[in-house]
Swiss-Prot record:
<dbReference type="InterPro" id="IPR036822">
    <property type="entry name" value="CutC-like_dom_sf"/>
</dbReference>
<dbReference type="GO" id="GO:0005737">
    <property type="term" value="C:cytoplasm"/>
</dbReference>
<dbReference type="Pfam" id="PF03932">
    <property type="entry name" value="CutC"/>
</dbReference>
<comment type="similarity">
    <text>Belongs to the CutC family.</text>
</comment>
<protein>
    <recommendedName>
        <fullName>PF03932 family protein CutC</fullName>
    </recommendedName>
</protein>
<dbReference type="InterPro" id="IPR005627">
    <property type="entry name" value="CutC-like"/>
</dbReference>
<dbReference type="GO" id="GO:0005507">
    <property type="term" value="F:copper ion binding"/>
</dbReference>
<keyword id="KW-0963">Cytoplasm</keyword>
Amino acid sequence: MTKLEVCCYSVDCAQIAEKAGADRVELCCGQSEGGVTPSVGALMQARETVTIPVHPIVRPRGGDFCYSSNDFTIMKNDIARIRDLGFAGVVVGVLDTDGHIDMPRMREIMSVSGSLVVTFHRAFDMCQNPMIALKQLAELNVARILTSGQQQNAELGLALLKDLVAATKDQGPIIMAGAGVRLTNMQKFIDAGIRELHSSAGRTVPSTMRYRKAGVTMCADSDVDEFSHYCVDGEVVEAMKSLLVMGSPLAKHT
C-alpha cells in the first residue's frame, strides 16, 4: 500500500498526524523557508510523544543547498544528535556549485548517519541532471528521494516522477512524490505507481490570542499575519489515508 508521510512544522502537528493515521512524519520548523532543522527541544519532545517514525530534516538555513564549511559541520553535528536520540531516519541533501550531488559530503553524511534511514530531500529538484543524481544517490544507498519531479509542484512533474519510478523498479531509492500533493490529486500519483506520498495536509489556523497588537510584525514582510499559523489538518490526513487504504490491492480484493 502507498505510504503517507506528513510534513509537520511542530510537535503539535506531528501528534495530530499520528492520531489521524499518517505512516511517518517529516519534522521541520520554518515553513516560510521551506523547512529547516527543528530545535533540540522539539526533537526531544517528538521522541517522547510521537510513536510513528519521525524523520527530522537537517537543513541549517533556507535558500540553496551548497553549504559553507560551518554549515556543513553544523549539519553533521545535528545528524549525530538525531542519531543518538534514537530517531528512525533523517532528511538531508547537499549539492555542489554546479548543481550536482556533492558526493564527498554526502559520503560523510551517510557515515555520520549510521543506522538512520536517509531521505534525500528536494535538493534533488535543483540538480542539473536528475538521472545522474538518481544513480549517485543509489550508489550512496540513500533510502528514498523526496521530489516534485523538478517542477514547482509534483503534479506538473509527473512525467519525470514516472521515469524515476521506472528506473528504480527493481532496485534503488524509493521515489516519494512531494510538493502540492493533496487529497484532490493524490490518485494521479497512486495510478503512476508511486509508493510513497509526502504532504503537509494542512490549513491556516487563527491565533488563540485575544489581544492583538496592530501595526507590528516579527517579520520583514509586513503583510504576514502574526495571528495565524499553519497546522496539519487531521481530517485531511484521515481522508488521504482512507483513499490509500481503499486503493490498496488488499482492499480491492475484499
